[in-house]
Swiss-Prot record:
Residue numbers annotated as active site: 79
Origin: domain of life: Eukaryota
Single GO biological process annotation from the record: tRNA methylation
Tissue-specificity statement: Highly expressed in thymus, testis, and at much lower levels in spleen, lung, brain, heart, kidney, liver, skeletal muscle and embryonic stem cells.
Organism ancestry: Eukaryota, Metazoa, Chordata, Craniata, Vertebrata
Family that this chain belongs to: Belongs to the class I-like SAM-binding methyltransferase superfamily. C5-methyltransferase family.
One Gene Ontology term, aspect cellular component: cytoplasm
Protein name listed in UniProt: tRNA (cytosine(38)-C(5))-methyltransferase
Classification via Pfam families: DNA_methylase
Record-annotated SAM-dependent MTase C5-type domain positions: 4-396
Keyword tags: Cytoplasm, Methyltransferase, RNA-binding, S-adenosyl-L-methionine, Transferase, tRNA processing
Phenotype of null mutants: Mice are viable and fertile, but show loss of 5-methylcytidine(38) in tRNA. Mice show delayed endochondral ossification, accompanied by a reduction of the haematopoietic stem and progenitor cell population. Defects are caused by impaired protein synthesis in the bone marrow and codon mistranslation by tRNAs. Mice lacking both Nsun2 and Trdmt1 display a complete loss of cytosine-C5 tRNA methylation, leading to development defects and impaired cellular differentiation causing lethality before P3.
Length: 415
């Protein structure tokens, strides 16, 4: 069987390409396209032999797309027009132009691709752009299914709820297809023995867990999951939810994804400790959760991602209870006892499923690394969706053990 010829649009730092490798589907990326030169340097660092085009998508003609002769499209269009905290410009946002161009040329290709996978933020599912996407692929004869999924549903201690669409050019619907509904979990794939994701593994497992869950995005004022008192700006509901997350033994601990060695350069500076102590989302190495890491991580505090309490034995409740009565210098001294630090870029990459060999060029700054990772995706989530999408193609059927794709009886859906 000939390998799939894959076109990777908005390729970024190569998350889709890594997911394709992890899925073990026979495939070859014929071209990766992105306009971000910094992201392209990282992509080239990790995939030096892939044909990488550093140009706008709308600058590529229909004829040039036809010459690539691809039968799969992987894409993650710009999310800013659809973010819940943004302006939600949707189709009127200039950053949507390239995606609208894709939808325009798709029906006019000499040969339609057989497979499509798209990733975007939660919020895309209620956009006019999504409506045009569905209208276009239906007119082309694709069967499709939409999802809202988080890495926590794979046992990964990170919340990153994202919209996904998988589409296949065929007349028969997917076995798990729910027309007009968005699935909140993976179709169940039965495996012989689930495996855990480990940072030190040379190759990542194709399928991990058979008991799906869904974890909502964290709010911007979260705190530690095991606290029994409200010592920060959080609600009782937030505290209880975080405690429930940390009690879920099917989710791995953060320590499985952390770097060894000296990380003092990532300690929060005193002025940030003093100013934002009540807004920090603090987790420990033994925690089983973390907030979504955004492109502003390391530059902004509120809502950009969790910070790690490196001093595990320090009593965070006692320290926070003592703060109101202390002068600024003593507050800083108390908070410094927690050894609060940012997650390193490598640790965030680990949580997002990038393989151990993934790396950045030396000239890529820490700020750039955080920004690029914040704009990327979870490799494990996409790899599993690719396995579902291409079930029956090449090694994909072997990775599924040729088991049927079904949904649990308690499947969650969003109408």
């Amino acid at each position: 069987m000939e390998p799939l010829r894959v076109l990777e649009l908005y390729s970024g730092i190569g998350g889709m390409h890594h997911a394709l490798r992890e899925s073990h589907i026979p495939a070859h990326v014929v071209a990766a396209i992105d306009v971000n030169t910094v992201a392209n340097e990282v992509y080239k660092h990790n995939f030096p032999h892939t044909h990488l085009l550093s140009k706008t998508i709308e600058g590529i003609s229909l004829e040039d797309f036809d010459k690539l002769s691809f039968n799969m499209i992987l894409m993650s269009p710009p999310c800013q027009p659809f973010t819940r905290i943004g302006l939600q410009g949707d189709m009127t946002d200039p950053r949507t132009t390239s995606f609208l161009y894709i939808l325009d040329i798709l029906p006019r290709l000499q040969k339609l691709p057989k497979y499509i996978l798209l990733e975007n933020v939660k919020g895309f599912e209620v956009s006019s752009t999504r409506g045009l996407l569905i209208q276009t692929i239906e007119a082309c004869g694709f069967q499709y299914q939409e999802f809202l999924l988080s890495p926590s549903s794979l046992g990964i201690p990170n919340s990153r709820l994202r919209y996904f669409l998988i589409a296949k050019l065929q007349s028969e619907p997917f076995p798990f297809q729910a027309p007009g509904q968005i699935l909140m979990e993976f179709p169940k794939i039965v495996t012989v023995e689930p495996q855990k994701y480990a940072v030190v593994e040379e190759s990542q497992p194709r399928v991990q867990r058979t008991g799906p869950r869904i974890c909502a995005e964290s709010s911007s004022t979260q705190s530690s999951g095991k606290d029994t008192i409200l010592f920060k700006l959080e609600t009782v509901e937030e505290r209880d939810r975080k405690h429930q997350q940390d009690s879920d033994l099917s989710v791995q601990m953060l320590k499985d994804f952390l770097e060894d060695g000296d990380t003092d350069e990532y300690l929060l500076p005193p002025k940030l400790l003093l100013r934002y102590a009540l807004l920090l989302d603090i987790v420990k190495p033994t925690s089983r959760r973390s907030m979504c890491f955004t492109k502003g991580y390391g530059s902004y505090i509120e809502g950009t991602g969790s910070v790690l309490q490196a001093a595990e034995d320090a009593q965070i409740e006692n320290i926070y209870k003592s703060l109101p009565d202390l002068p600024p210098e003593e507050k800083i001294a108390k908070l410094s006892m927690l050894k609060l630090r940012y997650f390193t870029p490598k640790e965030i990459a680990n949580l997002q499923g990038f393989p151990p060999e993934f790396g950045f060029p030396e000239k890529t700054t820490v700020k750039q690394r955080y920004r690029l990772l914040g704009n990327s995706l979870n490799v494990h989530v996409v790899a599993k969706l690719l396995t579902v999408l291409c079930e029956g193609f090449g090694n994909a059927s072997e990775s599924c053990h040729k088991m049927p794709l079904i949904l649990d009886s308690n499947s969650k859906i969003l109408s």
